[in-house]
From Swiss-Prot:
<protein>
    <recommendedName>
        <fullName>E3 ubiquitin-protein ligase BOI</fullName>
        <ecNumber>2.3.2.27</ecNumber>
    </recommendedName>
</protein>
<comment type="function">
    <text>E3 ubiquitin-protein ligase involved in the regulation of pathogen and abiotic stress responses by facilitating degradation of MYB108/BOI. Attenuates cell death by preventing caspase activation. Has no effect on the stability of the DELLA proteins. Not regulated by MYB108/BOI.</text>
</comment>
<keyword id="KW-0862">Zinc</keyword>
<dbReference type="GO" id="GO:0050832">
    <property type="term" value="P:defense response to fungus"/>
</dbReference>
<keyword id="KW-0611">Plant defense</keyword>
<comment type="subunit">
    <text>Interacts with MYB108/BOS1 and the DELLA proteins GAI, RGA, RGL1, RGL2 and RGL3.</text>
</comment>
<keyword id="KW-0175">Coiled coil</keyword>
<dbReference type="GO" id="GO:0009739">
    <property type="term" value="P:response to gibberellin"/>
</dbReference>
<dbReference type="GO" id="GO:0008270">
    <property type="term" value="F:zinc ion binding"/>
</dbReference>
<keyword id="KW-0479">Metal-binding</keyword>
<dbReference type="GO" id="GO:0042742">
    <property type="term" value="P:defense response to bacterium"/>
</dbReference>
<dbReference type="InterPro" id="IPR013083">
    <property type="entry name" value="Znf_RING/FYVE/PHD"/>
</dbReference>
<feature type="region of interest" description="WRD domain">
    <location>
        <begin position="178"/>
        <end position="214"/>
    </location>
</feature>
<keyword id="KW-0808">Transferase</keyword>
<dbReference type="GO" id="GO:0043069">
    <property type="term" value="P:negative regulation of programmed cell death"/>
</dbReference>
<keyword id="KW-0053">Apoptosis</keyword>
<keyword id="KW-0833">Ubl conjugation pathway</keyword>
Amino acid sequence: MAVQAHHMNIFSQFISPNRDCVKFQENMNHGEFEFTGGEVPLITGESFAVEPLAAKANFNKAESGLSYNFTVPPLSTKRQRDFQFSDSNAPVKRRSVAFDSSSPSLINVELVSQIQNQQQSEIDRFVAQQTEKLRIEIEARQQTQTRMLASAVQNVIAKKLKEKDDEIVRIRNLNWVLQERVKSLYVENQIWRDIAQTNEANANTLRTNLDQVLAQLETFPTASAVVEDDAESSCGSCCGDGGGEAVTAVGGGCKRCGEREASVLVLPCRHLCLCTVCGGSALLRTCPVCDMVMNASVHVNMSS
């Protein structure tokens, strides 16, 4: 059957702006064409003959675009001559092509649905890829920030620990110094305690001796009584018979300077022979009466 056409490329109007929307498949087993796409366009142009089972259409999608391979069987010269001078204003004859689907509208719906599903799947895949990439970047940033934060916290903690260690060492040294000071103070306290106990014992002894001297002085009838022998001592070695301990009052004045009244008792000979000034002198070592070495002296209040 001959169809008048004005264009040699009979499939020029089959090419859609969206190349993924048009797909021709050839069913070689049934000898039919399966078309999945939009509405079937009108074929116009120069006259040529198309056999239903002779035409082959292969549309393959490549990376660079769409490539078409269409083979048209040779037309007979007679048929071309018959239709070469046909009236150009004559109505265009259409040829129906056998399709597997029932109607073009269903094909359009299925094609649109398939395109939408494909686009939706591509969008979902793209969104999933971008989401995964963004998640990886966020995780990497979080890990980097976490490491930086951990490093900063570790540095601060290490600095604080070093300061605490230094403070512990300083306090430990100070504690050792204080312990040594406490030990020295304890030893010094013991020494002073011993000295205090010794001085207290000496004071008690001197107080007892003073009480005895004062008691003996009260037994004399008058303070002007003198002993005939100035060299006589009250020591036990000087008293041959009785061995009693008596105080010997030598004259009324000081045996060293002779100017003031004798008010200092010399021990251990117990001669009341020195005044207050001579008794407090550090140069006097012996008793001026008996020349006995002095080990102590007692001031006696002679006022009544």
